[in-house]
Swiss-Prot record:
Pathway(s): Lipid metabolism; phospholipid metabolism
Main location: cytoplasm
Annotated family: Belongs to the PlsX family.
Gene of this entry: plsX
Protein name per UniProt: Phosphate acyltransferase
Pfam family, any one: FA_synthesis
GO biological process entries: fatty acid biosynthetic process; phospholipid biosynthetic process
HAMAP family, sorted: PlsX
Record bears the keyword Lipid metabolism: yes
Native source organism of the sequence: Actinobacillus pleuropneumoniae serotype 5b (strain L20)
Gene3D superfamilies assigned: Isopropylmalate Dehydrogenase (3.40.718.10)
GO molecular function per UniProt: phosphate:acyl-[acyl carrier protein] acyltransferase activity
Length: 344
């Protein structure tokens, strides 16, 4: 296995280095050929880095910057203030070839904008799309894109998302002819706005893609499709609704309620039985395990973590980035698009 270097925006996210540094420690422990280039404030990071094992510290290069991009500022303001920030420096390291990929939990709009500005897009890609794997109740996963990089998308752009999602599913899920579906408010031919209906007609004509039609949001976790295509506005809402529902289910089972002693005892035994029997299934829908959306369509791997991610969730975002780099996702997307367009 070859050595791999990731650039990490240590300051990105709601909790900064208190989360990112313990998470990268887990990644270093799991991957002996992994190293990091970190970008962040030395005064905040040094105590946490010094607590890591010496063998891990030897695989970390630290670059100090006190500048960060705030999570709540508009996109244009974020770009103007980005020079010298931890996010921009991490992306510039990837652009220079000093790292094979970047992970950040910072401002989504700024990350998407800077990544498109600094990292070369793949040929024939109009716009990259935020892409992730969502869990299904049968233990398998589905690819979903776009999740917020493009709030608006016309039919041509949605078809391009379908092409990229198709290749991503082939590589990451080891599928042949993945089933593609278009997110809509119904499955009937006349449902949806004009863009959705036009996209539906275009995809029906693509015999190189296994397009199966519309899918509704209540079926997203039923594995009716391997790839779910949507604009960034709809995708972001749908994904957060899924994650919120999953978190509420998990917390509901753990949360104590003011019942009588007898009810509490009965409930405790019941919940214990449920957890023993369904623990693995519950973990399959744990949003932490699926944290990290890839900005698909760039020549390097860029992964966006949830800003509010905890240590385990951030570790999974790093782990997903590593897996995509090892799988050569950017090259596979480029080769796959060339193959698809040659067959048109």
């Amino acid at each position: 296995m070859n050595r791999l270097t990731l650039a990490l925006d240590v300051m990105g996210g709601d909790f900064g280095p208190r989360i990112t540094i313990p998470a990268l420690s887990l990644a270093l422990e799991k991957n002996p050929m992994l190293s990091f280039v970190l970008f962040g404030d030395q005064s905040q990071c040094s105590p946490l880095l010094n607590s890591l094992p010496v063998t891990q510290q030897q695989r970390i290069t630290f670059v100090h910057t006190s500048r960060i991009i705030e999570a709540d500022i508009p996109f244009t303001q974020a770009l103007r203030q980005s020079k010298g920030s931890s996010m921009r420096l991490a992306l510039e390291a990837v652009a220079r070839g000093e790292a094979q990929g970047c992970v950040s939990g910072g401002n989504t709009g700024a990350l998407v904008g800077l990544a498109k500005l600094l990292i070369k897009p793949l040929p024939n890609i109009e716009r990259p799309a935020l892409t992730t794997l969502i869990p299904s109740m049968n233990g398998k996963s589905s690819v979903m894109l776009d999740l917020g990089a493009n709030v608006e998308a016309d039919s041509q752009l949605l078809c391009q998302f379908a092409e990229m999602g198709n290749i991503f599913a082939e590589v990451m899920l080891d599928l042949v002819h993945p089933r593609l579906a278009l997110l809509n408010i119904g499955t009937e031919e006349n449902k949806g706005n004009q863009i959705i209906r036009d996209t539906h007609q275009l995809l029906k004509q693509r015999y190189d893609l296994n397009y199966i039609g519309f899918i509704e949001s209540d079926k997203l976790m039923n594995h009716f499709a391997d790839v779910i295509i949507c604009d960034g506005f709809s995708g972001n809402i749908a994904l957060k609704a899924l994650e919120g529902a999953a978190k509420n289910i998990l917390s509901l089972l753990k949360k104590p309620t003011p019942d009588s002693h007898l009810c509490q005892t009965a409930k405790r035994y019941l919940l214990r039985a449920i957890f023993y029997r369904y623990y693995r299934k519950l973990q399959q829908i744990n949003p932490d395990r699926h944290n990290g959306a890839t900005l698909l369509g760039l020549s390097s791997v860029v992964v966006k973590s949830h800003g509010g991610a905890g240590v385990n969730a951030y570790f999974y975002a790093i782990d997903h980035a590593i897996g995509q780099i090892r799988s050569g996702i950017p090259d596979k997307i480029s080769q796959g698009l060339n193959r698809l367009h040659q067959n048109l």
